[in-house]
């Protein structure tokens, strides 16, 4: 089984100049990792997005980063393309809505996270 992982390191062209300085491809036999590195002027590299793919080429997950920490709405999908999860992060911690779905498209769990902890009412669907 080969998994495709594409990690993109991007910088806002409005604030910083973008220059691809290196591209790599790694294979461990189980998956392939594609890496693109962007220079943030003289201050190093910044990762802003990570994409993973199922062996059939369907996107498995899409994760966003800000200042090196997971941030924003992150999603995952099943091999058939149906949604599997939507998690909200803020500065590296779970913060906001947290929803998971069964592979048949029905919700399995729904709740809210605050600073990495469950907050309020959580609903489990059977």
Annotate each language-model stretch with its function.
Residues 2-13:
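Sec-dependent N-terminal signal peptides
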Residues 18-126:
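Periodic aromatic/glycine/histidine/acidic cluster detector
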